């Protein structure tokens, strides 16, 4: 099936011509009210499901015509809590190649409060927004071989919204509950995909969301009539276990030359105090310390990191500021014709400030028990960009070494292997460490926003993992 076509698919794709807020939210911005024009009305699909008018709802969710939007896709809102009128926005792209068989991949952005429209337009969706607000095709879109489902999560993120403060998530249980409701509805609207392999993926703060929803699916599948065909998860530069990551910051920043000896000692002292609060479950006190070190959200002053490094960007240690083109999508989403095409009307596009407020105490809590359960039962990919600071590869490995799961001993003994895409490549794509169905990947030349920095390597990685193609280089 897919296997027989794989070398052809890879060859075709690879030969295509080449082209402050919250712990991880400085990349995400709110969209001002749209300019004058017809933005249409928001499309709520839950009433169509409940009325048995699924085909009608599906037809209405088809994304309308817009210059550059040349790939079939579907978008709309799914109501996940009627009491508070809480709704999650999704945008779904069936795979360009064999969509009837292709795995369905849920993508969740970090933040907390980062819109998955960032992943769509900046990282691996089919389109890239240009400076003049037009679209061009991405060179290595994940939608080539995978059916990609982008959801603005949690409620209050991006176009997702609620009418009541009680509708905001305060922990990962809330996040998972709402996502699960949305997924069940999604597969009711698109039943032809319910038996396809399903993967949950995401990056950064979604290192919490991904295990949370995967664990809930794992728990409910045995007792629910409607099952989600979960096959595995993939987490990029994931903030799954804050204590392990925070404990390694000072030494890592010193080793890459961003702190001197004196600054390292101060950073280490603050991180130690933060960890002490975490162990005592003083969540807000731990958040305060971390905020002063890295973000400065709670005060009007720059963070300690910003003061001593002179940089606002901790996503790639070769860059001091975020690339300008990572924000083009924000303005694009304010255009009335775009809003009409994706069925959001005049709904506010939120920057996640409120989401972060309600998840503040969640920020420093770990999802390691859930992640361990998933690692014991499913395929798992944990990947890092070599140039990331905030969730550096060394800090992820620090966390993995402290985990106890069925493959932990095999993982600790596993040899790190060089990974190249093609045998003839002079450049090394990255490094692989594998234990059974667990894969750890470090990609060279990439930072926190990995598919943006290294689109081809990210594309090859996700396809090798999901399609089980191994890590040997292709001949050619």
From Swiss-Prot:
One biological process term in Gene Ontology: proteolysis
EC identifiers of the protein: 3.4.16.-
Active site annotation, chain numbering: 204, 388, 448
InterPro entries: AB_hydrolase_fold, Peptidase_S10, Ser_caboxypep_ser_AS
Residues that carry a glycan: 81, 132, 307, 346
Annotated signal sequence range: 1-22
Keywords: Carboxypeptidase, Glycoprotein, Hydrolase, Protease, Signal, Zymogen
GO cellular component: a single term: extracellular exosome
Pfam families (UniProt xref): Peptidase_S10
Domain of life: Eukaryota
Annotated SUPFAM superfamilies: alpha/beta-Hydrolases
Tissue: Expressed in macrophages but not in other leukocytes. Abundantly expressed in heart and kidney. Also expressed in spleen, leukocytes, and placenta.
MF term (GO), any: serine-type carboxypeptidase activity
Gene3D superfamilies: alpha/beta hydrolase (3.40.50.1820)
Keyword Signal: yes
Similarity comment text for this entry: Belongs to the peptidase S10 family.
Listed PANTHER family: SERINE CARBOXYPEPTIDASE CPVL-RELATED (PTHR11802:SF472), SERINE PROTEASE FAMILY S10 SERINE CARBOXYPEPTIDASE (PTHR11802)
Function per UniProt: May be involved in the digestion of phagocytosed particles in the lysosome, participation in an inflammatory protease cascade, and trimming of peptides for antigen presentation.
Protein's name in the database: Probable serine carboxypeptidase CPVL
Species of origin: Homo sapiens
Gene: CPVL
């Amino acid at each position: 099936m897919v296997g027989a076509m794989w070398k052809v698919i890879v060859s075709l794709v690879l030969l295509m011509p080449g082209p402050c807020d919250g712990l991880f939210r400085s990349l995400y911005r709110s969209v001002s009210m749209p300019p004058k024009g017809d933005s249409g009305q928001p499309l709520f699909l839950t009433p169509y499901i409940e009325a048995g008018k699924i085909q009608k709802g599906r037809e209405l969710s088809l994304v309308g015509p817009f210059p550059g939007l040349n790939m079939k896709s579907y978008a709309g809102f799914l109501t996940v809590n009627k009491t508070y009128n809480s709704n999650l926005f999704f945008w779904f792209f069936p795979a360009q190649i064999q969509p009837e068989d292709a795995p369905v991949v849920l993508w969740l952005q970090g933040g907390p409060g980062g819109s998955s429209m960032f992943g769509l337009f900046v990282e691996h969706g089919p389109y890239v927004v240009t400076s003049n607000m037009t679209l061009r095709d991405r060179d290595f879109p994940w939608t080539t071989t995978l059916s990609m489902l982008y959801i603005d999560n949690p409620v209050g993120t991006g176009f997702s919204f609620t009418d009541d403060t009680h509708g905001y998530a305060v922990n990962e249980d809330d996040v998972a509950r709402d996502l699960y409701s949305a997924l069940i509805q999604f597969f009711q609207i698109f039943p032809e995909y319910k038996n396809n392999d399903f993967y949950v993926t995401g990056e950064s703060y979604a290192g919490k969301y991904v295990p949370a929803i995967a664990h809930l699916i794992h728990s409910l599948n045995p007792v629910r009539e409607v099952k989600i065909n979960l096959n595995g998860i993939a987490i990029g530069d994931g903030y799954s276990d804050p204590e392990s990551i925070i404990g390694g910051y000072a030494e890592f920043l010193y080793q890459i030359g961003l702190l001197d000896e004196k600054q390292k000692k101060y950073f280490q002292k603050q991180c130690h105090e933060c960890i002490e609060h975490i162990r005592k479950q003083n969540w807000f006190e731990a958040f305060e310390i971390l905020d002063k070190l890295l973000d400065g959200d709670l005060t009007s002053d720059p963070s300690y990191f910003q003061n001593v490094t002179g940089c606002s960007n901790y996503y790639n240690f070769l860059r001091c500021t975020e690339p300008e083109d990572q924000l083009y999508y924000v303005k694009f989403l304010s255009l009335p014709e775009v809003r009409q095409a994706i069925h959001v009307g005049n709904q506010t596009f939120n920057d996640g400030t409120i989401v972060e407020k309600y998840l503040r105490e969640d920020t420093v809590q770990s999802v390691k028990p859930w992640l361990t359960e998933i690692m014991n039962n499913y395929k798992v990919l944990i990947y890092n960009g070599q140039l990331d600071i905030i969730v550096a590869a060394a800090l992820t490995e620090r966390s993995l070494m402290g985990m106890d799961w069925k493959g932990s001993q095999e993982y600790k003994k596993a040899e790190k292997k060089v990974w190249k895409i093609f045998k003839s490549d002079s450049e090394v794509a990255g490094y692989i460490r594998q234990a059974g169905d667990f894969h750890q990947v470090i990609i060279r030349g990439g930072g926190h926003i990995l598919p943006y920095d290294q689109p081809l390597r990210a594309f090859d990685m996700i396809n090798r993992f999901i399609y089980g193609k191994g890590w040997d280089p292709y001949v050619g």
